[in-house]
């Protein structure tokens, strides 16, 4: 709201003051001798200069980090000084690792806010949803940690979505690869991109519950001989797909058939999620929201490209992923 007012050229003093007063209440409740006056003055100046929505979105995390560091007696490190994005806004993994290694070399304990960093020009840039998981993973890799503990509001991963399956069993051990598959298909305990930094460093992740710290949680590892009770480790799924089924007699003997079909989707900027096929049939699964407005154009181009006997559509589908070992 406050930044929206700044964008509209409105007076933001009142809104920002209310936020500052709330933070002061928190500081007082924690019994801290801490003032955020200087930080709020900087925020006001940057809001008025329209520093960007990413800057605005990250200020709560930034201020909470300062308070947490003060409460714990740890050093505060602004993520904008150690988490690096390139000039195009893409995360720069290697540069970030170098900067973090140098920054943390002589620091024993620190608090680093999550989900944002900065581009080369100093402009604040945020990660996508769940970016705090990524920040923790990046720092764990830079520190060459023995383990990355990720504290959340659930006791690790469950074998299925508890909103759909009653009494879903907890997963005690899962591999990076299995987790990537489940996260991509909708399991949302841990941001899928958080796996890459620690995987490079061979660092296991332990998902723990803040509200039940005694629970074992889920260990995420590179590989394991620990076999689950069942062959299936977990099940996850996503909604919102459409299936385009293409039939043509002797399809299997026609050179380049699949390539021609896939080129149609590529030319229209539609990503393909799944592609099962048979001797005379291939089915392409795509995100329905990407396909619906281009539907007739795509169908016409498929007919022109491969002259199929028939093309059928089935909408409002879900894709289910079954992940396991054995």
Predicted regions mapped to residue ranges:
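Terminal amphipathic helices with adjacent charged low-complexity linkers/tails
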Residues: 1-4, 158, 207-224, 286
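Nucleotide/pyrophosphate-binding catalytic subdomain
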Residues: 1-190, 195, 287
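Short hydrophobic alpha-helical runs that function as membrane-insertion/retention elements
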Residues: 147-151, 205-207, 273
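Acidic/polar loop patches that form or flank catalytic/metal-binding clefts of enzymes
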Residues: 191, 202-209
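A conserved regulatory-domain signal marking ACT and ACT-like small-molecule sensing domains
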Residues: 216-326
